[in-house]
Curated annotation (Swiss-Prot):
Designated name of the protein: Homoserine kinase
Extent of the signal sequence: none
PANTHER family, A to Z: AMINOGLYCOSIDE PHOSPHOTRANSFERASE DOMAIN-CONTAINING PROTEIN, AMINOGLYCOSIDE PHOSPHOTRANSFERASE DOMAIN-CONTAINING PROTEIN-RELATED
Record pathway: Amino-acid biosynthesis; L-threonine biosynthesis; L-threonine from L-aspartate: step 4/5
Family: Belongs to the pseudomonas-type ThrB family.
Residue spans crossing the bilayer: none
Annotated GO biological process: threonine biosynthetic process
Reaction catalysed by this enzyme: L-homoserine + ATP = O-phospho-L-homoserine + ADP + H(+)
Keywords on record: Amino-acid biosynthesis, ATP-binding, Kinase, Nucleotide-binding, Threonine biosynthesis, Transferase
Catalytic activity, EC: 2.7.1.39
Highest taxon above the source species: Bacteria
GO molecular function terms noted in the UniProt entry: ATP binding; homoserine kinase activity
Length: 332
């Protein structure tokens, strides 16, 4: 969510003519992230987010925006795209597709505890089940084919030890993806990027008995149809780790995974390949962070992520991964 494309006051005024959102009160760029240009937009009708899509094409974009509308319609708290005056969910701004979505309540919890992980686990399972009847199909664009395409471009910049890990894990994952067990894993629309800064929490009502309330999931622009276990692995690799070492926090991981299973129990194949999928989740973000670090795009505001974080996580997952926790029958 960096700003690669600037939007002037006159650009915004022209753009807003296609929406019935009242008068603009405030507009500012969002500096975090690395993929799209994002802006907070406040009008007399409410608070929104304007996104200019720097890589996604007009042909690809309906998958993401329609998925968000679908999930919102099924009670999953996600940003809801706002239709334009012609009924479309996006238009063109500076020659690039752009959209306005509702802004969720709450703030990110960057130091999550067990209760936060329980909320995330349950809602992620609800998201997966809500997407089962979503009619569009688009693969996760940052999966195995993307890794195979981009790893060669990264290799000249890294050490021999890193290269051995990067290329060796790619061989391992290619074999896993080609297996019958992988083909049997449950799949459907996935968020694919459910990090702690893509989830908002609000204060719970006093009569609920809870300290936190999930405000919603956002930033669906890496979403795709993938194995649900991959989505869980990506989530656990961020929500349930010690940030300094990449080691899993067993209490948080156990809480998230048990909460997920109260909504959707894991299959036998998923249990067998939990370690492989945690490695896949770590590998995906190590590759993308290496690529963005060594081959960056120009941006007005950009905060690059540390590739070493996911290298540490990958090494940890190769060395040790606890089994998926069992749950009591009464919780099913």
């Amino acid at each position: 969510m960096a700003v690669f494309t600037a939007v002037s006051d006159s650009d915004l005024a022209q753009w807003m003519r296609h929406y019935e959102l009242g008068d603009v009160l405030a507009f500012r760029g969002i500096p975090s992230g690395i993929e799209n240009s994002n802006f907070f937009l406040t009008t007399t009708r409410g608070e929104y987010v304007l996104t200019i899509f720097e890589k996604l094409t007009a042909e690809q974009l309906p998958f993401y925006l329609d998925l968000m509308s679908h999930l919102a319609g099924h009670g999953v708290p996600v940003p809801d795209p706002i239709p334009r005056d012609d009924g479309a969910l996006f238009g063109m701004l500076h020659g690039k597709p752009a959209a306005i979505v509702t802004k969720l309540d709450g703030s990110a919890e960057l130091a999550p505890g067990v209760e936060h992980c329980i909320e995330v686990g349950q809602m992620l399972a609800r998201l997966h089940l809500a997407g089962r009847d979503y009619p569009r199909n688009q693969p996760n664009l940052r999966s195995l084919p993307w890794w195979q395409e981009n790893v060669p471009a990264i290799v000249p910049f890294i050490t021999d030890e890193q290269r051995a890990l990067l290329e060796g894990e790619l061989v391992h994952q290619a074999g896993f993806f080609a297996s019958d067990d992988y083909a049997a894993l449950p799949a459907g629309p996935c968020h694919c990027d459910l990090f702690r800064d893509n989830v908002l929490f609000a204060h719970a009502a006093p009569d609920t008995g809870h300290d936190v309330r999930l405000g919603g999931f956002f930033d669906f622009y890496f979403a795709g149809c993938d194995k649900w276990l991959f989505d869980v692995a990506v989530t656990v690799n961020d929500w349930c780790v010690d940030l300094a070492t990449g080691v899993l926090d067993v209490a948080r991981a156990d809480a998230l995974l048990r909460a997920y299973q109260t909504v959707r129990p894991f299959t036998a194949e998923e249990r067998r390949h939990w370690s492989d999928m945690l490695r896949a989740g770590a590998y995906r973000f190590w590759v993308s962070r290496l690529y963005d670090f060594y081959l960056p795009r120009a941006a007005e505001m950009l905060k690059p992520h540390d590739p070493g974080h996911f290298e540490r996580i990958l090494r940890e997952r190769i060395a040790h991964t606890p089994a998926l926790p069992e749950i009591q029958t009464a919780c099913n």
